[in-house]
């Protein structure tokens, strides 16, 4: 492969090169793993190629699976994180214990474990695409909204995080 990089590209100062982003992308995503109630990995088909991303849901924050060791009520916090993770999996129709099935974008969406519709916004501070998740394309209510209405997650606008109420 013949490839030519200019000095400006190699030095990283060429501002004319766009930063890759999924901002405004909409499409199906096949969930491959769920970390907690607001972070998951999924595969999307982009320009005919499967690509895996770590996504962060927009609009809410869930308790952390690994809170700091000195945290007060740490066990309760972990319990709340597991509840949020399990609810997210259920709302997305994802079962990580289900047998692996090959997936292609032409399969019936109701028969694929963890196939969801996503709408991407900008990236968060860690570079993860921020997404609104829908169980099916055309659903009126997003998974994000259902998580917020459940009360086990906090509304989050990307700024200061609220502490979690451990009333379960």
How does the language model describe each region?
Residues 1-168:
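Small beta-barrel nucleic-acid-binding modules, primarily SNase/OB-fold domains
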């Amino acid at each position: 492969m013949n490839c030519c990089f200019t000095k400006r590209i190699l030095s990283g100062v060429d501002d004319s090169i766009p930063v890759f982003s999924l901002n405004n992308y909409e499409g199906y995503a096949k969930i491959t793993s769920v970390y907690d109630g607001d972070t998951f990995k999924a595969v999307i088909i982009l320009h005919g190629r499967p690509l895996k991303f770590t996504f962060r849901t927009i609009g809410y924050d869930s308790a952390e699976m690994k809170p700091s060791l000195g945290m007060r009520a740490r066990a309760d916090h972990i319990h709340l994180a597991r509840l949020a993770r399990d609810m997210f999996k259920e709302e997305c129709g994802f079962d990580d214990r289900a047998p692996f099935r090959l997936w292609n974008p032409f399969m019936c969406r109701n028969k694929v474990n963890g196939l969801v519709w996503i709408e991407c916004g900008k990236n968060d501070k860690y570079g993860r695409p921020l997404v609104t998740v829908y169980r099916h394309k055309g659903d009126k209510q997003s998974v994000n909204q259902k998580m917020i209405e459940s009360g086990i997650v906090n509304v989050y606008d990307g700024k200061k995080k609220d502490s979690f109420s451990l009333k379960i």
